[in-house]
């Protein structure tokens, strides 16, 4: 019996050595960047803190260098860390690394839309979306007027709080939601509209779930975990509900479409779909249009909403910054004129604060996953087609050489010695290259105008002592999620 046990142990030992030998051969068959040795099935899971994966990337970069290989389960990934290599990936190799790595939580969006899509469908849909959004006012006066109009409605709702504590999540968030809704549907909604509040709740919950430890695990092992109970089921259900809403809106617009008078982005896509009605391989299908609308609605609402909400919390933490903003707003805009984009040139401090909020919160620390579209030689390494590429934005936004004391909130990071706004090429909050955020211009405009409007009319009042405000995110994964809080808005006396 003892001999049998020894024999079994030897067989297991030999099988393990053989498996490791084969694994090493596969691992070293390409000139991959260095990295920790992966274990079967789980890959490098043990080297990652699933509660703070970006921090794990920083630690591994210190050991293996700015470009290193990891296995997320069985998925090979190359992590790129630091300003120069990240810029090279996003700009110098923008075609080679323009693919989108898979996100299991959005599998039903695969091959459609503009966020989680790949290939020719993505390129054509993105190109059309950029052109149409630009024509509808993306970055032009049309969007400025949209935001100014929405700021008026937002201020009305904020005045009704009458200085009492309230949660700003869906109040402040309704402004960017209405701006993108007007672009997509040529329609804005009342701040009490239940369908809109439901959608915003889904966006908010999804952003949190995508950043939770369980979803980090699920993304790496979807084939094993999909049958188990867990928050991935809630995420998938939410994504399905948002997509169903978008499809319903598409069908409603299709019924009432007037090709000679398109009402917005959605109508323009439907007109293109009609042109393809005899095509054997149409691009503008109901599915693709619905997912594109869902992508734009989610991205156009949640990222700006979260940034504004985080920004207000930061300003309550640093009342001296808020005081300087009030002084600049009073001097340049005054108490009653609507803030305008042209004011940015005369308001370097607010411009710097808006940039510093985005840099400091580092909303998408690891960017969205990229993917190699072909075998690529990068910095002497061979990165095979299909490899996930992770250009870490936090390593650029928190570069100590560019931003002294990057862990601190300092608007001076974007001001020169004369107090003028100082642009930094390290500011990559919207990513860059082929996968840069399509709404970057709109988001920049919204953040500046909405923050200016709020501070023009209100003082921010925290329910706790400013020094006790904790700015730490409650979850770090896909994004950094700010803590929930309440605040009071005290009307400012007219000057």
Swiss-Prot record:
GO biological processes: epoxygenase P450 pathway; xenobiotic metabolic process
Enzyme Commission code: 1.14.14.1, 1.14.13.n7
Positions bound to substrate: 298-303
Catalysed conversion reaction: an organic molecule + reduced [NADPH--hemoprotein reductase] + O2 = an alcohol + oxidized [NADPH--hemoprotein reductase] + H2O + H(+); (5Z,8Z,11Z)-eicosatrienoate + reduced [NADPH--hemoprotein reductase] + O2 = 19-hydroxy-(5Z,8Z,11Z)-eicosatrienoate + oxidized [NADPH--hemoprotein reductase] + H2O + H(+); (5Z,8Z,11Z,14Z,17Z)-eicosapentaenoate + reduced [NADPH--hemoprotein reductase] + O2 = 19-hydroxy-(5Z,8Z,11Z,14Z,17Z)-eicosapentaenoate + oxidized [NADPH--hemoprotein reductase] + H2O + H(+); (4Z,7Z,10Z,13Z,16Z,19Z)-docosahexaenoate + reduced [NADPH--hemoprotein reductase] + O2 = 21-hydroxy-(4Z,7Z,10Z,13Z,16Z,19Z)-docosahexaenoate + oxidized [NADPH--hemoprotein reductase] + H2O + H(+)
Keyword set, alphabetical order: Endoplasmic reticulum, Fatty acid metabolism, Heme, Iron, Lipid metabolism, Membrane, Metal-binding, Microsome, Mitochondrion, Mitochondrion inner membrane, Monooxygenase, NADP, Oxidoreductase
Pathway(s) it belongs to: Lipid metabolism; fatty acid metabolism
Regulation: The omega-1 hydroxylase activity is stimulated by cytochrome b5.
GO molecular function: arachidonate epoxygenase activity; heme binding; Hsp70 protein binding; Hsp90 protein binding; iron ion binding; oxidoreductase activity, acting on paired donors, with incorporation or reduction of molecular oxygen, reduced flavin or flavoprotein as one donor, and incorporation of one atom of oxygen
Residues given in the record as heme binding sites: 437
Membrane topology listed for this record: Peripheral membrane protein
Keyword Metal-binding included in the entry's annotation: yes
GO cellular component: cytoplasm; endoplasmic reticulum membrane; intracellular membrane-bounded organelle; mitochondrial inner membrane
UniProt-listed InterPro entries: Cyt_P450, Cyt_P450_CS, Cyt_P450_E_grp-I, Cyt_P450_E_grp-I_CYP2E-like, Cyt_P450_sf, Cytochrome_P450_fam2
Highest taxon of source: Eukaryota
A Pfam family annotated for this UniProt entry: p450
Cross-referenced PROSITE patterns: CYTOCHROME_P450
Subunit organization: Interacts with chaperones HSP70 and HSP90; this interaction is required for initial targeting to mitochondria.
Function in brief: A cytochrome P450 monooxygenase involved in the metabolism of fatty acids. Mechanistically, uses molecular oxygen inserting one oxygen atom into a substrate, and reducing the second into a water molecule, with two electrons provided by NADPH via cytochrome P450 reductase (NADPH--hemoprotein reductase). Catalyzes the hydroxylation of carbon-hydrogen bonds. Hydroxylates fatty acids specifically at the omega-1 position displaying the highest catalytic activity for saturated fatty acids. May be involved in the oxidative metabolism of xenobiotics.
Family: Belongs to the cytochrome P450 family.
Protein name per the record: Cytochrome P450 2E1
Native organism: Bos taurus (Bovine)
Species classification: Eukaryota, Metazoa, Chordata, Craniata, Vertebrata
Gene name as annotated: CYP2E1
């Amino acid at each position: 019996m003892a001999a049998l046990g020894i024999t079994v142990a030897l067989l297991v030992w030999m099988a393990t050595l053989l498996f490791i030998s084969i694994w090493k051969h596969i691992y070293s068959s390409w000139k991959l960047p260095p990295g920790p040795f992966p274990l079967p099935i789980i890959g490098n899971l043990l080297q990652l803190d699933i509660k703070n994966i970006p921090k794990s990337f920083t630690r591994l970069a210190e050991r293996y260098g700015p470009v290193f290989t990891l296995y997320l389960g069985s998925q090979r990934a190359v992590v790129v860390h630091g300003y120069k290599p990240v810029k090279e990936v996003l700009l110098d190799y923008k075609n080679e690394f323009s693919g989108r790595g898979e996100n299991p939580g959005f599998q039903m969006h695969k091959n459609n839309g503009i966020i989680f899509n790949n290939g020719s469908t993505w390129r054509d849909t993105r190109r059309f979306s950029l052109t149409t959004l630009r024509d509808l006012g993306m970055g032009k006066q049309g969007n400025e007027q949209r935001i100014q109009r929405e700021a008026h409605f937002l201020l009305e709702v904020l005045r009704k709080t009458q200085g009492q504590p309230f949660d700003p999540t869906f109040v402040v968030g309704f402004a960017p939601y209405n701006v993108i809704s007007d672009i997509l549907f040529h329609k804005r909604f009342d701040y009490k509209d239940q369908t809109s509040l439901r959608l915003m709740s889904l966006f908010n919950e999804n952003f949190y779930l995508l950043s939770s430890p369980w979803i980090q695990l699920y993304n790496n092992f979807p084939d094993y975990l999909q049958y188990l109970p867990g928050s991935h089921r809630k995420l998938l259900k939410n994504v399905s509900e948002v997509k169903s809403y978008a499809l319903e809106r598409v069908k409603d617009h299709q019924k009432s479409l007037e090709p000679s008078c398109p009402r917005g982005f959605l109508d323009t896509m439907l007109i293109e779909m009609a042109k393809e009605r005899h095509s054997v391989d149409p691009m503008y299908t109901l599915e693709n249009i619905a997912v594109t609308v869902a992508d734009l609605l989610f991205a156009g609402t949640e990222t700006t909403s979260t940034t504004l909400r985080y920004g207000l919390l930061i300003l309550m933490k640093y009342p001296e910054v808020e005081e300087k903003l009030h002084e600049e707003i009073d001097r340049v805009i005054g108490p009653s004129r609507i803030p305008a984009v042209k004011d940015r040139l005369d308001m370097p401090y607010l411009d710097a604060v808006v940039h510093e909020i985005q840099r400091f919160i580092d909303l998408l620390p690891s960017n969205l996953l990229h993917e190699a579209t072909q075998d690529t030689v990068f910095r002497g390494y061979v990165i095979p087609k299909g490899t996930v590429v992770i250009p870490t934005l936090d390593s650029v936004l928190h570069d100590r050489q560019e931003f002294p004391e990057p862990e601190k909130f300092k608007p001076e990071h974007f001001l020169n010695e004369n107090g003028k706004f100082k642009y930094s090429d390290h500011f990559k909050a919207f990513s860059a290259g082929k996968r840069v955020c399509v709404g970057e211009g709109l988001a920049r405009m919204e953040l500046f105008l909405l923050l200016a409007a709020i501070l023009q009319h209100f003082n921010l009042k925290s329910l706790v002592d400013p020094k006790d405000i904790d700015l730490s995110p409650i979850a770090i994964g896909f994004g950094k999620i700010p803590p929930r809080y309440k605040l009071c808005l005290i009307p400012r006396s007219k000057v």
